[in-house]
Amino acid sequence: MFDDGQERGAMIWKKAPRRILAATAGGVLVATVAGCSGDDPPDATPVAEQLAQAVASGDLAGVPLGDTAAEDATAAVEAIVAGMGAATRTVTVTDLEQTDDENTRQVTLDVGWDLDGSGAPAAEPGTESPTGTAATTSTPTPTASGTPDAPDWTYQTTATLRVAEDTEAGWTVDWSPAILHPQLSDGATLDLSRTQATRADILGAGGEVIVTERPVYRVGIDKTRVDAALAPESATALAEVVGVDPAGLAERVQNAGERAFVDAITLREADAAPLLAQIEAIEGAVAIEDTLALAPTRDFARPILGTVGDATAELVEESGGRIVAGDVVGLSGLQAQYDAQLGGTSGLTVELVPPEPSGDPTATATASPAAEEPAPAEPEVLFEREAAPGTPLATTLNVELQSRAEGLLADVAPASAIVAIQPSTGAVLAAASGPGGEGYSTATLGQYAPGSTFKVVTSLALLRAGLTSDSAVECTPTATVDGREFSNYSDYPSGAIGDITLREAVANSCNTAFINQNAVADQASLAQAAASLGLGAEYQVGAPAFLGTVPAEADGTAHAASMIGQGEVLASPLAMATVAASVAAGHTVAPTMVDPAATPPEGTLTADEAAVLQDLMRAVVEEGSGAFLGDVPGDPVGAKTGTAEYGTETPPRTHAWMIATQGDLAVAVFVEDGESGSRTAGPLLEAFLGG
């Protein structure tokens, strides 16, 4: 039986309601209604929260929807958001209040969309929209917070809850697509489109443009322009013209969709020009004009700068939504390391796509076709974020010096490198790696024994132990430490054997003179001296770099080998150029390849120490193994030759090194397989300094 004030199915309560605030499980304050007696309707908050979670997930199962089946509502949501790609949404209850009808409640939902994969929570209403309009709690105006954690698109929507005695919760939801967005109606959908931003340039010293958009041709097979059975044959022919793997291209073409364009290669305009006629003669082969971020030449600083191209599946997956299939992104080098900066922010547009129009069932047979088939309504833009171009990346590379270095290494068969640093700033002006490295950045990442170029470091350790440049050291034909015999290089001048000064030992590169001092400078002092010259340090160069390792502990033959830059001592050409730069600058130099400059290290090298080292390096040119540099035009040159044995062959193979300073320039030259520093690296250094 029911009391007089109630009706079956309607569950009407007559008590005057009051609006209160209660905290939900998610911490959101929700307005609820409490009556004055046990006859009041149950709390609607759980249903409101259940609805919010369901709208967020797209699964309406379990939500009391009145006359609408949960599976129908779920299917409707799925259809509405099918065009939103991987975008995700959060939905929270912000208000729940009684309407004019005391048996209904209106729930207000905050909806926040993460359109670009940032995974951010919803923003507060009232923040600035992309158009500068403040969003309010009563309109669905899109908003964008100025913080990185804000969603891309936010708005509010409402839903109506009704008292229902036949449900466990006591309430049902009036289902409508408008719960997902206020402007949605039956059959309407949401569609997200994305515009990739303009990629920024990579700049060199003085702001000179190095990498910018340059004309290219995308060459491939258009399967709509060739019979499917002949497509693999065309692919093979095209591969032979452009120099790619014929079998691989043919297989990709065979497996691609019937309307696919299958890329074979992207060619610079100048490289493609002589091939265009041959490409055109192949059925289905096309060359499409395009642009791509490229350096001045194909090989210009390629191991450093890297390349750009179509995003791989792995990059898309790892980007968290920032990158999508079809984007052109950095694939290696600085292009990949600074891709977010260079790539900018993609533009996003969400449109409401109206339902397809249907013919008027009351139309007569004489009605015009236009009347029978109304023109489709235009999509309406609900949210738009313009693409923001990338920010240029400023590097320290000097185009002229980099080009000169690469030109000198072009015909060097083994792995090789030339690195130039400006001592006054630490700026890396050139970091060229020869073709023998097969694309590896020998200049910055190579790990090799530095040989006698390390004697600059050993000299600093000896100076700190009390020696001077005029101190006598014993240059013997051989030196034996713990049973291991060390000797000088084969054509060491016989006149420089015996008691000589430290200056003469450096000038002529006497191995035994330094090994005979192994008790004067221990391994720890070598490591400290190396750090004072920037070798073995951990500076933020701005690009991947190996700045060397010098063990702090070693004794016996290992320590003796360290005295002449062998054993476990390793350096890259960049590291040895840093040593030379520190000598020239008069203080420890931190090399920098990308602005802003690296934090200068604490001053561990004194000006007085550097002055002595400068004199020792000048002695190499004035009276020693670098005499051939004496006539290089310009400021006086200081240098140090280096030859480092490696491998197990007899006689052992050797790395060829040379470092030099001239004015505000420090240079390191390296050839992985060479005769000696002066004979192999020396001519390259002389040509580089001579311009």
Explain the meaning of each model-derived region.
Residues 179-196, 211-221, 228, 253-256, ...:
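Short pre-catalytic segments that frame enzyme active sites
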Residues 371-373, 380-381, 414-447, 461-673:
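Beta-lactam-recognizing serine transpeptidase/beta-lactamase-like catalytic domain environment
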Residues 30-60, 121, 588:
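C-terminal region of N-terminal signal peptides and the immediate post-cleavage residues
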Residues 39-46, 60-106, 115-119:
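Short solvent-exposed beta->alpha transition segments
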Residues 172-176, 180-182, 190-202, 211-244, ...:
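Small/polar-residue-rich segments within soluble enzyme cores
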Residues 37, 58-59, 91-105, 260-282, ...:
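Conserved SxxK-family serine transpeptidase/carboxypeptidase catalytic domain
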Residues 120-126, 130-132, 142-192:
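Short beta-strand edge/turn micro-motifs at domain boundaries
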Residues 12-38:
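Secretory targeting and sorting signals
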